[in-house]
Amino acid sequence: MTDNVNHPRHYTQAAAQLEPIDVLRYAPFCIGNCLKYVIRAGYKGDALEDWRKAQLYYAWATENLIQTEEFLLNYATLLVKFDRLSLLRTAPSQFLEDLKTMIGGNIRALEIVCKQN
């Protein structure tokens, strides 16, 4: 009997014997969906439709790449700033200004990405 929840047939029959979740759980949404449709093309429903969906998600991922990179850079910078909590003790006003700037940048980048998806 096929386990349609944990191992759906349209994924386990694919030539690569690779279930999308093995890769997708680590991928950004649009890239993950692109890969999902490529892996299952021809095994569930209309193959051409899956390829078109993959192409569409690839285009969206490409459009969002710059915003995503900026978001990740800002997020990484924010984490570094949090790691330097000693600045909070020595220069609290500067720390708070930096924090406001970084959080504001992340919120703007996230809003842009969400609006495009």
Regions found by a protein language model. Give the residues of each.
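Intrinsically disordered, low-complexity regulatory regions
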Residues: M1-N117
